[in-house]
Amino acid sequence: RAEGAGRAGRRLFAAGLAFGWIFLTRPLDGLILGGLTGIWVLAGPRGSVARAAAYAAGCVVTGALLLLHNLAMTGSPLRMALSDYLDGHWAPGANAFGFGPDIGPPGRWGALDLWPGHGPAEAALNTINLTASLQFDLLGWSVGSLALIYAFFLWARGKRVFDWAMVAVAATVILVMAFYWFADSYYFGPRYWFLAAFPLFYLSARGYDALRARFPAGEGAHVRIDSILALSCLFGLLVFTPWRGAMKYFEYGNFHTSYRRALAAGTFGNAIVLVAKNGEPGSAFMLNDPWFAADRPIFLLDTGTLDEAALKAAFPGRAIVRFDAGWQARDARG
């Protein structure tokens, strides 16, 4: 028994390390999922204080790295670098979590923020938009990806403890994210809800079981509904996924591959390349080597005000060339 308890403790500690790492990379996600997992470890089946302590210890070991990072970047272990940056460029508290009149970007940030500040009405509207996107993006079914989840709530009999745990996880993710001002439903769908992906897939499977049980018994009784499911899955795999991955965001935001192709062809050598404003300059900037390797070019935006003498002094031995990609947008959305 002691050996088994020790093995379980090591696994819980490892799980804590993983959730602490999530907290390090995406703090809010780590708090949500790590906190819910901690409650399950403490109060769920076979839960105990000892198990929760092993899990919490792992969380602290890796999660504390975020506090050290914050301290190095902002001077305070509790102040995030992103919040510090946006406080300086937007307004103090602009990236805060919750409701308030000064939360969010100035000037609506290209119409991505509906109203100044963030309040319950905007949170409700964001949630509605994200749900509408989820019914298409979750499974890639144009007939509605949430249908199986509806079936779970309507017809699933003998709901299990784990079923309700998954409902709680999904609901918590949706509720907590409503308090953040940026929903991003306009660009990439409900990506801030991705923590709810597994619970939603699980509930969809349970909903399909419930739907299947409602069909009459007998030989071949489930052929039709199984065929519908298979056809819908094939549509999601063979039609929706290629479109979503390769077509929907092709040259979206005026990003294009002209600079990448020219770089691959050896056009630039190790020159300092002043690119004309043609599409999104980030298409070129993303190709910059962060260490300014001697055999790689350096891309800069040609603003007409750059001090070329200073550039030559900073990067001796590099030619300065101007490059116009000659690219034109094919999608009016940009």
For each feature predicted by the language model, list its residue ranges.
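Membrane-interface alpha helices of multi-pass inner-membrane proteins
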Residues: 11-26, 37-38
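Perimembrane helix-loop-helix junctions
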Residues: 4-10, 32-68
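Membrane-embedded, lumen/periplasm-facing catalytic core of multi-pass transferases
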Residues: 220-280
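Membrane-lumen/periplasm interface segments of specific transmembrane helices
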Residues: 21-23, 29-30, 51-144, 236-240
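Signature aromatic-anchored transmembrane alpha helix within multi-pass, membrane-resident enzymes
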Residues: 17, 56-60, 170-171, 201-202, ...
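Hydrophobic, aromatic-rich transmembrane alpha-helices
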Residues: 38-42, 123-167
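Transmembrane alpha-helix segments characteristic
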Residues: 19, 36, 58-62, 144-150, ...
